[in-house]
Amino acid sequence: MFYLMVLLLVACAPQQATQQEAQAATISKMRFHCDSDTTVINQLLAKGLESGLTDANALVEFYARQLLGTPYVAHTLEGDEELLTINIHELDCLTFIETLYALTRATMAHRNSWRDFAANIENIRYRGGEMGDYSSRLHYISEWIIDNHLRGNLVEVTPDLPHVDYMVKNIDYMTHHTDSYRQLKNDTAMVEKIRRYELRNHRFPYLKRSWLNDKEVKAALRSGDFITLVTKIEGLDVSHNGIIIVDDKGDPYLLDASMSGGKVMLESKPLFKFLERSKTNIGVRVFRIMP
């Protein structure tokens, strides 16, 4: 059962609040999975500060390893009302990388409170960093990357990789499959709102999966890089997300919230081998947290 919390923080914000505190003060409505979420988040942030790590990629990897074994659960953000959902106990492939971003960004700012984590979640999950209704959520990874790059959260490194290619595609899966989305089934007004933000003839960089075993490509990838799997499914840009872990031999692996594995896990095969079995994933995009 979800617990609702209304935070009235604006009046409590100190006069000389930091940017992080000001962001935290804007959070209005939240939904927690259970009452231990805030405790677990605070414990994770304390571990991050104690680690002494300052590099963003190193922190992403550190926190990903802390979350190994967390159950995979889909649709945790969905409810009758759009609320800022915080669920550290159940993750899907997108909430996993959002969580890694929020933890890492808090630690880089020397913050150790779940409130800072929550502000970072709102910042990365919603267009312009502000939660509104369902349409304010960044549903498509292509817009998610663009919006977060413009606001200084993320940088895409795909264009700088050797052998990069480009694809042009309409990103409009949601409005063509409204029955698959609870909030769109019987709400034509919301469908039209979503349609406004869908991308037409969108050109984006990607690396074909055949290059993932290339020495130059492997040398350009870092542990803690975010990665998305590009799909050939009509109307969709990507179908899965995770992070890269580079082993001692220089081979990149995928660490993800795995639907098939049922938990956050490090995949057993190198990334190029992992993608060989897929009939729909044709390549990858790679991005990092901005310093």
Segment roles from a protein language model:
Residues Q19-E98:
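Cationic-aromatic interfacial patches
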Residues L9-A11:
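C-terminal motif of bacterial Sec signal peptides marking the signal peptidase cleavage site
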Residues A13-Q15:
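Bacterial signal peptide processing site
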Residues L67-F204, R222, V246, G250, ...:
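Acidic/His-rich structured neighborhood in mature extracellular/periplasmic domains
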Residues M1-V6:
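Sec-dependent signal peptide recognition
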Residues P205-V217, T231:
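Short alpha-helix capping/helix-loop boundary micro-motifs
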Residues E216-A220, L236:
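Short, surface-exposed secondary-structure edge patches
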Residues D225-P291:
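C-terminal soluble interaction/assembly domains
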